[in-house]
Design a protein with these regions (language model features):
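ATP-binding/phosphotransfer module of carbohydrate and carboxylate kinases, centering on a glycine-rich
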Residues: 1-173, 178-205, 213, 250-253, ...
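Phosphate-binding/catalytic loop of phosphoryl-transfer enzymes
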Residues: 141, 217-325, 450-459
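Gly/Ser/Thr-rich active-site cleft segment
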Residues: 202-240, 287, 331, 336, ...
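Transmembrane beta-strands of outer-membrane beta-barrel proteins
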Residues: 147, 206, 281-285
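Short, flexible micro-motifs
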Residues: 155-156, 210-215, 285, 289-293, ...
Length: 459
């Protein structure tokens, strides 16, 4: 197996699952286990696999169940996990998903998103439900004068779009993740909107692409507000985009439709519009890993797709994510953090006091000069990606894969793509024909805000 040169202990989830399947087959007494994640509206996701019998290597059995259940939660979302097939796996997960358990972060996050207490429930085999999917139409509207705003962790982008033509776009550096006062966030967002509006005769709609989880345009969870005290989250943070749109509506004396979507889904939407096709998985590698999906019907599934928190590395000593407290999750493999991590693994010493965005720029500058360590960093991220695509494909039906974000900029992005394709062809030939690509440099940088502009239907 081709491993990252700077991270030799990487143990891809797909390899771990294949090894586990081999172990189960060797044992000869497979136990059928079903995990069901339930979310709002009665929608659910059903995943069935074969496990070892109770009492046979319980530690491995439990770890596989825990990694799979966690992956499903961050792919699909949910406030309830049902378990059928193994009482001991059920008991283990029930203890793990508590505020005192190893999955306390997940419990707190999901109960906040869905505004319901999180629980793990036993199911008899004959009670396992059929899967119930959603498919929601998003975006692709281009009529009128539109503002598209993309709230990145390091810069904010805004576009003014008139009947599908971009008349203005800008990127402005900001620091939302280290700012405690939410009025800073509000004023920065409003300033961006007003700048775009000043380039058009009127404003008909506002579309927003932003990292995090959104329900009815409300901010349920978002890393942009990481430093804002939870007591201030209430209505002030939760309704921030709604309130900005109200202020813009007052300026123009009419109600301006607003649509807020997860930045990952907008990434995928940008790709679907560009490709004129569906089945698009978009991955934006920037401050974190943002993932979105446009299904084969051209809609979104109503899934979280917060794969920044989904495991990609089964190695128990993988790098820890500071926010979730978990190890081996996507945000440390497909983001600027991955570049920094691999640079440090390679013995590189950054100057004191640099922000993560500045550290990325240091490595990008080295890459522009064809520095061998920088090239190795990007190659290793390509190896990570090649081993992760078959794991993601267990949950998403992927025809096209679109790679965006700051990490994919310049020569480094080309190395990631070329390495990924090469390793896929060698190790996973069934994925060799997958269409994986980068948008051109301009749409790479501002494509998100332009796609965001297409989100709302006009009145």
């Amino acid at each position: 197996m081709k491993l990252p040169v700077l991270d030799k202990n990487f143990y891809p989830m797909i390899k771990a699952l294949n090894d586990f399947d081999a172990e189960v087959n060797k044992n000869g007494n497979p136990v059928k286990v079903t995990l069901v994640a339930e979310r709002s509206g009665g929608y659910n996701y059903v995943y069935t696999y074969n496990a070892l019998p109770d009492g046979v290597n319980d530690a491995l059995n439990f770890r596989v169940a825990e990694r799979l259940s966690k992956t499903i939660l961050w792919v699909v979302g949910g406030f309830k996990i049902y378990v059928a097939g193994s009482k001991s796996i059920y008991e283990y997960l029930k203890n793990a998903y508590t505020l005192d358990g190893i999955r306390a972060f997940d419990v707190d996050f999901m109960s906040g998103v869905y505004e319901k207490p999180f629980e793990v429930v036993w199911l008899n085999e004959d009670e396992v439900p059929a899967q119930k999917n959603a498919s929601i139409r998003v975006g692709g509207y281009l009529d009128g004068c539109r503002i598209g705003f993309d709230a990145g962790g390091s810069d904010r982008k805004v576009s003014a779009v008139i009947n599908g033509e971009v008349v203005y776009s800008e990127e402005v550096v900001w620091n939302p993740k280290i700012t405690e006062d939410p009025t800073y966030h509000y004023n920065e967002i409003l300033t961006a909107m007003k700048t775009a509006a000043s380039k058009m005769p009127t404003v008909d709609t506002i579309g927003v692409s932003s990292a995090g989880v959104y329900v009815d345009n409300k901010i349920m969870v978002a890393s942009l507000f990481l430093k804002v005290d939870k007591s201030k989250h209430g209505d002030y943070v939760k309704n921030m985009y709604i309130n900005v749109a109200k202020e813009m509506s007052q300026i123009y004396g009419k109600e301006i439709p607003l649509e807020v979507a997860n930045d990952g889904d907008v990434t995928a939407l940008a790709g679907a519009i560009d490709l004129n096709d569906n089945g698009v998985l978009g991955i934006a590698m920037g401050t974190s890993e943002a993932v979105g999906y446009i299904n084969s019907n051209g809609g979104i599934n109503g899934w979280l797709s917060e794969l920044a928190f989904a495991p990609v590395d089964f190695n128990e000593n993988a790098m820890q994510d500071e926010w979730s407290g978990d190890f081996g999750v996507g945000c440390k493999y497909f983001s600027q953090d991955a570049v920094i991590k691999l640079a440090e693994y390679g013995g590189f010493k950054f100057e004191d006091g640099l922000t993560p965005a500045q550290k990325l720029k240091v490595i990008q500058a080295l890459m522009a000069k064809d520095d061998p360590l920088a090239a190795q960093i990007y190659e290793d991220i390509g190896v990570y990606l090649a081993h992760t695509i078959p794991f993601y494909a267990k949950f998403y039906d992927i025809k096209h894969m679109l790679l965006l974000g700051r990490v994919m900029g310049g020569k480094g992005g080309d190395i990631i793509l070329a390495t990924c394709k090469k390793v896929l062809a060698e190790e996973y030939p069934e994925f060799a024909g997958l269409d994986i690509g980068l948008p051109d440099e301009n749409s790479r940088r501002v494509g998100q805000s332009i796609a965001a502009a297409s989100l709302p239907a006009s009145k």
